[in-house]
């Protein structure tokens, strides 16, 4: 028997198909308010609800209970449903996106805040032409070089007596710690990059560097190939910086006596400065004549320049390295196969490409910029496809595979949630699913059994790196919901990663500092930069959280204090990271900024 029209009306679905698909609240009108705002009134359709409805009487009123929903039959009050006995932990595994309040204008917030940026004139494009003369050390100021290295800089009164910097190096040095006989030879500086077989510089042959070292006794001469001299200069600079940083850290851990005699400068420091300037003058030649040596050298330069230039300049330097890679067709599968056949170091060159690509994706997205090149534009063989797998390098290959997935995910998140102007599709659920899958892979990799000492300590660095990159992806994913107050997942992740970084770097456990000093190698800048960046963004998120929660405004969050503690310690290794501490302690309005896209992008959370 047919039901009455009233019964049919009661059985209509509570939400239209548009709101139901988006998993958002619906006011039940036809068309509903949300479809009117989205200019899709024709798509506002209500399906028949085939679920069994149960009539209940409470407080003299008849109400219908549709499973988990409690709807008043005459007024707008929501009745408490005490008949549900569901497992609270089941909510953890729900795949739904955080629901927006129907009062929020989805055209402004929605699931992407590209509209927010566009209204404020935010530019997500990358100016890929980078002027190398804009480096912090463009004036070849040796005082600045000493400070960025964390070396003991002579006073200005001693400056005229102790050294006289020139455009290409130093002259007139009065005193140096090492004599010419006792100072590390150039071959020793090369060896530093290859002393750990588990973590030597990929793509570069030590024997090739020995040949260049004997071929170019004077790097300032105009004869020879620019790319070869550039590669040798960057290797020698990085070797000098690594040994000198070890000396500085080990000395500071022993006593407070002066490391150098008065008016003296370490020859390692002066050599590093000399090699840096020699490499810098050759960069324009690299960009106009791309070669494998030039590409490898520029990737190394991007490594040690981490401690000398701003984050934005680091981004553009990595883009220049990628430009060389694209010019060499390192993003092309066919050309890479030819490289593997013709070059014995081809595998390492491809690994260098993936490393600099991952780094550039991370730097681009945290600056609110589109990546220079996406994975869809790359057919380069993955590390797992070209590297021989054994027990020793399985961990390293798996690390690279997950790192590439995280870089890809960060790029997807930024493009779909921040750049795309499409408002008809909600990609958040798929992105969140990808994020959870990568997180699971990281968790499994952390359980990889390791019983060799060197591999164990190496894995600690790699796993923390993955945790930091995962946290950064999470911050990008949940940032719009933090702004609208619809989810605190970013806050949860911020607290978690701060604890993880603190446990590995805090000086409250002496073994942490001992491990960092004893195992400091040529790549010491990258992991510390990643940790510092993650701590900085975490603190900004916690500051936003305090703004939202009124009763927390006058208190200091425990994790915030831990993060500042670690940042203060890391500044002792990378003094340039003091900029990140200043961003946290002295936040300024984005309208007062002078083009620092990192501060502008994350500072918008606080205003």
UniProtKB/Swiss-Prot annotation:
UniProt subcellular location: Nucleus
Keywords: DNA-binding, Metal-binding, Nucleus, Transcription, Transcription regulation, Zinc
Residue spans binding DNA: 16-44
Pfam families recorded: Fungal_trans, Zn_clus
UniProt record, GO biological process: DNA-templated transcription
Domain of life of the native organism: Eukaryota
Recorded GO CC terms: nucleus
Keyword match Metal-binding: yes
PROSITE patterns membership: ZN2_CY6_FUNGAL_1, ZN2_CY6_FUNGAL_2
Keyword DNA-binding: yes
Primary localisation category: nucleus
An annotated Gene Ontology molecular function: sequence-specific DNA binding
Protein name stated in the entry: Uncharacterized transcriptional regulatory protein YNR063W
Species whose genome carries this gene: Saccharomyces cerevisiae (strain ATCC 204508 / S288c)
Lineage: Eukaryota, Fungi, Dikarya, Ascomycota, Saccharomycotina
């Amino acid at each position: 028997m047919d039901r009455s029209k009233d019964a049919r009306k009661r059985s209509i679905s509570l939400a239209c198909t548009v709101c139901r698909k988006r998993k958002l609240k619906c006011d039940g009108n036809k068309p509903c308010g949300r479809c009117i705002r989205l200019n899709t009134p024709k798509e506002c359709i209500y399906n028949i609800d085939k679920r069994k409805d149960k009539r209940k009487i409470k407080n003299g009123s008849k109400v219908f209970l549709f499973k988990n929903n409690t709807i008043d039959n005459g007024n707008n009050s929501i009745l408490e449903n005490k008949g549900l006995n569901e497992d609270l932990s089941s909510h953890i595994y729900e795949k739904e996106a955080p629901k927006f309040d129907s009062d929020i204008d989805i055209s402004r917030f929605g699931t992407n805040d590209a509209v927010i940026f566009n209204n404020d004139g935010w530019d997500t494009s990358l100016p890929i032409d980078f002027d190398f003369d804009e480096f912090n050390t463009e004036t070849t100021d040796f005082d600045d070089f000493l400070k960025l290295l964390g070396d003991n800089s002579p006073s200005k009164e001693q400056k005229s007596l102790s050294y006289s910097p020139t455009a290409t190096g130093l002259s007139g040095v009065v005193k140096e710690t090492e004599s010419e006989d006792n100072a590390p030879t150039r071959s020793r500086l090369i060896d530093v990059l290859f002393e750990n077989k588990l973590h030597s510089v990929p793509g570069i042959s030590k024997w090739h560097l020995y040949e260049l070292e004997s071929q170019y006794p004077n790097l300032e001469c105009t004869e020879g190939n620019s790319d070869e001299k550039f590669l040798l200069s960057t290797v020698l600079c990085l070797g000098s910086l690594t040994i000198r940083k070890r000396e500085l850290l080990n000395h500071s851990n022993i006593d407070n006596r002066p490391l150098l005699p008065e008016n003296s400068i370490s020859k390692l420091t002066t050599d590093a400065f000399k090699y840096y300037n020699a490499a810098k003058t050759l960069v324009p030649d690299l960009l106009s004549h791309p070669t494998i040596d030039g590409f490898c050298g520029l990737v190394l330069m991007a490594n040690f320049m981490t401690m000398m230039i701003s984050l934005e300049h680091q981004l553009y330097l990595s883009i220049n390295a990628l430009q060389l890679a694209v010019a060499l067709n390192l993003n092309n599968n066919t050309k890479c196969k030819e490289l593997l056949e013709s070059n014995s170091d081809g595998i390492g060159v491809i690994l260098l490409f993936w490393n600099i690509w991952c780094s550039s994706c991370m730097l681009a997205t945290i600056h609110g910029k589109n990546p220079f090149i996406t994975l869809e534009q790359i057919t380069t063989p993955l590390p797992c496809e070209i590297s021989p797998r054994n027990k020793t390098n399985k961990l390293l290959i798996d690390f690279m595979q997950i790192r590439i997935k995280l870089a890809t995910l960060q790029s997807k998140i930024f493009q779909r949630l921040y750049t795309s102007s499409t408002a008809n599709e909600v990609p958040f659920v798929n992105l969140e699913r990808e994020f959870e899958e990568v997180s699971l892979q990281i968790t499994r990799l952390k359980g990889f059994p390791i019983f060799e000492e060197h591999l164990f300590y190496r894995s600690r660095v790699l796993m923390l790196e993955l945790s930091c990159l995962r946290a950064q992806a999470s911050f990008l994913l949940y940032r719009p919901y933090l702004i609208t107050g619809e989810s605190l997942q970013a806050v949860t992740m911020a607290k978690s990663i701060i604890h993880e970084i603190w446990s590995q770097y805090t000086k409250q456990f002496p073994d942490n500092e001992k491990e960092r000093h004893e195992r400091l190698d040529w790549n010491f800048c990258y992991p510390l930069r990643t940790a510092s960046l993650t701590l900085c963004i975490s603190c900004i998120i916690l500051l936003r959280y305090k703004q939202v929660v009124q009763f927390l405004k006058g208190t200091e969050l425990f994790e915030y204090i831990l993060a500042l503690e670690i940042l203060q310690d890391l500044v002792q290794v990378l003094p340039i990271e003091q900029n990140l501490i200043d961003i946290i302690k002295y936040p300024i309005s984005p309208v007062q900024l002078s083009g620092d896209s990192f501060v502008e992008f994350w500072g918008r959370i606080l205003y």
